[in-house]
Regions:
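Short acidic, gly/pro-rich beta-turn/loop elements at beta-sheet edges
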Residues: 37, 68-70, 83, 286, ...
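Short C-terminal domain-edge/linker segments immediately following a structured domain
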Residues: 88-95, 103-106, 306-309, 351-354, ...
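Active-site-proximal substrate-binding groove within the catalytic cores of carbohydrate-active enzymes
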Residues: 132, 162, 167-188, 245-247, ...
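Short, low-complexity, polar/charged sequence segments that are solvent-exposed and flexible
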Residues: 47-53, 77-81, 294-297, 339-343, ...
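Aromatic-lined carbohydrate-binding/catalytic grooves of carbohydrate-active enzymes
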Residues: 219-371, 384-389, 395-407
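Carbohydrate-recognition beta-sandwich/jelly-roll modules
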Residues: 1-276, 281, 300, 316-319, ...
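Acidic/polar residues at beta-strand termini and the immediately following turn/coil
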Residues: 1, 48-50, 392, 404, ...
């Protein structure tokens, strides 16, 4: 254990490298000592400039891993970025996006999942810094076992951000690449559009318009109000969520017939377009016994009651989808077999009992597509016609790795298996959703549970760690539908404004599965259902117009972060004033080139 620096190498050589596409410096590091003995460990770095673009590539290349067990490689290091000026700022893709001026008064805390790419800590594998209109974009070309770390003390005067690489199945194993693009006269819009161009070059940009050619029901989802409800909650006594002091809080049940009546009521109240996301619909209850989740909850009405609810939804032209889960692997599942749980290189199998279902490990994602096919066939066999399906945590939590020889899996392969689950649903005409959004999922994910700003996941009133900016939407607004929290937290903070600014879909009602978790806080202004419907209609009407449009620009009006404006590719703009708690929607007839 401990830190080893590049300059600790006993032998370091450099050579100039010229190729047909650029030139750079190849450096070789070897002769590292451990307990006084020279180890065979050896690696190279290649830093080169691409002639056609001027982009700078930094490559870390393992040659021999014998002798040292490397846990993390911190390279390239952070840029020098110290001056207490608001025009010097850092862009992080922590959830929807955050802009940290060097003058920001709040310290930046460690992001969720420690800033690992492919998680909620980094929806996209890049960061950027801009100083007085000049900046750089750092893209991790090999993001699967990589992340970032950032440091900004309260009040500045600096922000440091850099890449790190981590092992895959216990070894560094493969070449790691970071690409730097340097820009003049740039801002966060330029940065995001530069990254979008990169994604398009890779063939990974897939718009909703393109997806709707294969699955036309996408057009029906655009403009819907989102309704998040549940059927059965059962908290196992050995779950961390179990409350022995108040056992009546642990379990509750709502019948399918009751939910059906609520749908009828919403229709009578004038709700025209609606999507119902249904939790806890199966016999075990929410977050229990996955992946063996059926049958439909008998106490709530069974398959017959569930089918009646679905048929009523379809009678009104509404869309229906279920919550499902193919990562959490519960020991209570009848088919549970430790041989198919994710196994670490040291032979251990991670376990916890955080959620309602109690003790669990993680299902190796190589198995997930098979369980998806099995379970969705059972739903189809019972006449449940699904429009959508939510596969929990796939786009929020890190990819898993598994070292079981029967189904060895890298993190990169894990993301590919998760995408296979989405693709299977698309083939069946079912629109796939997951918890949040992520760069790796854009080609196959249609919508999400939410894609919030990071501050929305902390208790109301917690100081913001930077200025919330829609970095993800500046890249991918026209690719993935995102419903937004609509809570009015106080007279000074209304999440509806963020929903409008982002051109997203509204939550009509969002019943969180766990109290004070995942942004579902009780501290908010109470509203009647009529008020919620009225507010959701405003957001739905806007989403109907801009849901398939690119967000072409985001700005601070007259440089004021409290007054923000977005412009979409069809000319519609949204301006919100967070101080006055007002919004304005206009058609500026602005078209992107």
């Amino acid at each position: 254990s401990g830190n080893i620096f590049f300059h600790d190498a006993g032998e370091i050589t450099h050579e100039l490298l010229h190729t047909g596409v650029g030139e750079g410096i190849l450096s070789t590091y070897c002769g590292f000592k451990k307990e006084g003995k020279i180890m065979p460990y050896k690696f190279q770095t290649l830093v080169w400039v691409e002639e056609a673009t001027g982009d700078v590539y930094c490559e870390w290349i393992p040659l021999c891993e014998e002798g040292l067990e490397v846990k993390k490689v911190f390279w390239p290091g952070p840029m020098e970025f110290e001056e207490k000026k608001g025009s010097w700022y850092t862009l992080l893709t922590h959830q929807q996006g955050i802009l940290i001026p060097n003058t920001w008064e709040v310290e930046f805390q460690t992001p969720v999942f420690d800033g690992m790419f492919g998680t909620a800590g980094a929806y996209m594998p890049w960061f950027a810094q801009v100083r007085d209109g000049e900046g750089y974009l750092a893209v991790c070309v090999t993001p699967w076992n990589s992340g970032y770390q950032a440091e900004h003390p309260a009040g500045g005067p600096y922000t440091r951000v850099s890449m790190r690489f981590e092992p895959s199945l216990g070894k560094m194993d493969y070449r790691r690449i970071v690409k730097y693009t340097f820009l003049k006269e740039c801002d966060h819009n330029t940065i995001c559009k530069t990254y979008r161009n990169y994604v398009e070059e890779q063939g990974r940009l897939r718009t909703l318009a393109e997806k709707a050619i294969r699955n036309p029901s996408i057009d029906r989802l655009i403009g819907c109000a989102f309704l998040h409800k549940g059927i059965k909650t059962f908290v196992q006594p050995d779950s961390d969520f179990y409350d022995p002091e108040k056992p009546e809080k642990n379990n509750h049940l709502t019948t399918f017939a009751q939910r059906e009546q609520e749908i009828r009521q919403l229709h009578e109240m004038g709700v025209e377009k609606l999507y119902l996301h249904l939790d806890g619909w199966a016999e075990p209850g929410y977050d229990n016994r996955h992946p063996d989740y059926g049958p439909a909850c008998k106490e709530a009405g069974g398959w017959e009651g569930m089918k009646s609810l679905v048929d009523t939804m379809h009678k009104y032209g509404y869309l229906f989808g279920i919550h499902d889960q193919y990562r959490d692997y519960y020991l209570s599942a009848p088919s549970f077999d430790e041989n198919f749980a994710c196994r670490l290189p040291d032979g251990t199998i991670p376990r916890h009992k955080r959620w309602a279902g109690g003790p669990q490990s993680y299902l190796c994602a190589t198995q997930a597509p098979y369980y998806v096919k099995r379970n969705f066939k059972a739903l189809e066999d019972h006449g449940i016609r699904l429009d959508c399906a939510y596969l929990d945590v796939f786009t929020c939590n890190e990819g898993d790795e598994c070292d079981n020889p029967l189904h060895r899996m890298t993190r990169k392969e894990c993301y590919e298996h998760r995408a296979r689950c989405f693709q299977y649903l698309l083939k069946k005409g079912i629109l796939p959703s997951s918890e949040e959004v992520n760069d790796w999922a854009v080609t196959s994910q249609v919508f999400c549970h939410y894609a919030p700003y990071d501050f929305m996941m902390r208790a109301p009133g917690t100081p913001k760690q930077g200025i919330p900016v829609p970095l993800y939407n500046l890249v991918y607004h026209d690719c993935v539908i995102q419903p937004w929290m609509m809570e009015k937290i106080s007279e000074e903070e209304d999440y509806m404004l963020y929903a409008l600014l982002n051109g997203g879909a509204p939550y009509l009602v969002r019943d969180g599965a766990y109290p004070n978790t995942d942004g579902a806080f009780e501290d908010r202004v109470e509203m009647t259902l009529e008020e919620c419907i009225t507010r959701a209609k405003v957001v739905s009407d806007l989403h109907e117009k801009v849901g398939k449009c690119q967000m072409v620009r985001h700005e601070f009006v007259e440089g004021n972060p409290q007054v923000q404006k977005t412009v979409f590719s069809n000319g519609i703009s949204v301006q919100v004033d967070f101080q006055k708690q007002t919004y304005e929607i206009r058609n500026e007839n602005y078209f992107s080139e």
